[in-house]
Amino acid sequence: MIGLSHYLTVAAILFTLGVLGIFINRKNIIVILMSVELILLAVNINLVAFSAYLGDIVGQVFALFVLTVAAAEAAIGLAILVVFFRNRGSIAVEDVNMMKG
């Protein structure tokens, strides 16, 4: 049977991959956004696993809220990225500091 430790191990691996993705690839904004999504997915797995383990639904409801915030964050981030690419022709992180405003 799959226990709590299995879910926590998968979540720890996903969290580590997300953090490594941010630290290793600092040049591409898309990879950074995907790494942030991996981190949020790991948090959601932890919330749902502990919620099921404790028999409480609060963790699952909170995971649903985290999913909606993550979807909004991804949509806004990609929209900003598309506008930035149309204006600059590049999605390099070094060019982001040249934004006006």
From Swiss-Prot:
Q: Where in the cell is it found?
A: Cell inner membrane
Q: Kindly give the Pfam families that the UniProt entry links to this protein.
A: Oxidored_q2
Q: Which GO terms describe its biological process?
A: ATP synthesis coupled electron transport
Name the Enzyme Commission number(s) assigned to this protein: 7.1.1.-
Keyword terms: Cell inner membrane, Cell membrane, Membrane, NAD, Quinone, Translocase, Transmembrane, Transmembrane helix, Transport, Ubiquinone
The record's GO CC annotations read: NADH dehydrogenase complex; plasma membrane
The record's catalysed reaction(s) read: a quinone + NADH + 5 H(+)(in) = a quinol + NAD(+) + 4 H(+)(out)
Q: Which GO terms describe its molecular function?
A: NADH:ubiquinone reductase (non-electrogenic) activity; quinone binding
- Write down the membrane topology: Multi-pass membrane protein
Residue stretches spanning the membrane = 4-24, 29-49, 65-85
How is this protein organized at the quaternary level?
NDH-1 is composed of 14 different subunits. Subunits NuoA, H, J, K, L, M, N constitute the membrane sector of the complex.
Q: Family membership, please give it.
A: Belongs to the complex I subunit 4L family.
UniProt function note? NDH-1 shuttles electrons from NADH, via FMN and iron-sulfur (Fe-S) centers, to quinones in the respiratory chain. The immediate electron acceptor for the enzyme in this species is believed to be ubiquinone. Couples the redox reaction to proton translocation (for every two electrons transferred, four hydrogen ions are translocated across the cytoplasmic membrane), and thus conserves the redox energy in a proton gradient.
What is this protein's name?
Answer: NADH-quinone oxidoreductase subunit K
Q: Which organism is it from?
A: Methylobacterium nodulans (strain LMG 21967 / CNCM I-2342 / ORS 2060)
What is the taxonomic lineage of the source species?
A: Bacteria, Pseudomonadati, Pseudomonadota, Alphaproteobacteria, Hyphomicrobiales
